[in-house]
Amino acid sequence: MSERFLVTGGNRLVGEVAVGGAKNSVLKLMAAALLAEGTTTITNCPDILDVPLMAEVLRGLGCEVTITDDAPGDRSVVTITTPAEPKYHADFPAVTQFRASVCVLGPLMARCKRAVVALPGGDAIGSRPLDMHQAGLRLLGATSEIEHGCVVARAEELRGARIRLDFPSVGATENILMAAVLAEGETVIDNAAREPDIVDLCNMLVQMGARISGAGTSVLTIQGVERLHPTEHRVIGDRIVAATWGIAAAMTMGDVRVTGVNPKHLALVLDKLRSAGARISFDVDGFRVVQPDRPRAVNFSTLPFPGFPTDLQPMAIGLAAIADGTSMITENIFEARFRFVEEMIRLGADARTDGHHAVVRGIPRLSSAPVWSSDIRAGAGLVLAGLVADGTTEVHDVFHIDRGYPNFVEQLQSLGGLVERVGGAE
């Protein structure tokens, strides 16, 4: 039997929890190491399954990769030595196991002028096509087609261009950005993603010698350079993990201090928790959430940064399920994310969906049941729901959670949560 979590509800979460590096940042930073011959070092890397998977992808492209412990628990140092001529075929099994593997496309085009990248796997949260990635590469002078389950791209040379994205896609912004840093001339990306992870990537690329302006705005301007050099870079704190702990504190009427993250990256999320009745305080490297009473109902609508993150939608539904009043949650990014609601209904949630909307009428307490994770964030949301359910909830397919939450069980236990990992050895 595969591993599962046993979550017994009833305890408040109280204490302090440290957040490691951002999953949505570290994998792209690792891919960016392909852009420079030599050894790049990335610190504050989270201990999640996708990091060794990305290491396997890079090894398949000719890099030497080592992962060493940096601090007790959940942080590592990743060292990547990139050869003078990386391989350009990324069509082996590791590539298909997680979505972020596609971010090697841009660096391979920049260094090799050709790339064969297997279509990636990852979370089952709806359609995430590569159309914008391919369109951006074509504007830079490449051809790009889907052939035999792979993205196949080629170029004699890459030239700067003005590229307007139909939607501020994080992945498309990253791939076009990494291709453009070594292209000839100026590239302008209009309607670029503004996420902190994009800013983190831009900061690392600038340290490597790239010329980029506009990071954190909707217009990125890149002046191509002839070559980049290796660097050392520290990954930003994971705002999604940090917000998960904040929402968990609110759901359990707890008191949790979260460190290792820039609270400015979570301004809207923390405002929503304040609207739900939480007391929020800040310091230099984190925030504290104190929820004195049952949370009040709050409406949520997911949007690209600086809007409410789609990755936190399952946790928002979990909060709404036990809040006082009725909440509406609108999903504007990934249409299939509401399949999580079916599992919440197993736990007794009064919820219904209609297209991009979910209406949740809060009840004082959920009831335990066996539930199944469909993706990283849904899994975390189900664990949080189990913390406010009567009895013991079994959360299955927890390998999803391990892809995004380092030492999740241990950190919950440190805050007083009654959570146990079982199975896997039968």
UniProtKB/Swiss-Prot annotation:
One of its GO terms (molecular function) is UDP-N-acetylglucosamine 1-carboxyvinyltransferase activity. Phosphoenolpyruvate binds at K23, N24. Pathway: Cell wall biogenesis; peptidoglycan biosynthesis. The keyword Calcium does not apply. Cell wall formation. Adds enolpyruvyl to UDP-N-acetylglucosamine. NCBIfam families: murA (TIGR01072), PRK09369.1 (NF006873). Belongs to the EPSP synthase family. MurA subfamily. Keywords: Cell cycle, Cell division, Cell shape, Cell wall biogenesis/degradation, Cytoplasm, Peptidoglycan synthesis, Transferase. It catalyses: phosphoenolpyruvate + UDP-N-acetyl-alpha-D-glucosamine = UDP-N-acetyl-3-O-(1-carboxyvinyl)-alpha-D-glucosamine + phosphate. GO terms for biological process: cell division; cell wall organization; peptidoglycan biosynthetic process; regulation of cell shape; UDP-N-acetylgalactosamine biosynthetic process. The gene is murA. It comes from Nocardia farcinica (strain IFM 10152). Transmembrane segments: none annotated. This is UDP-N-acetylglucosamine 1-carboxyvinyltransferase.
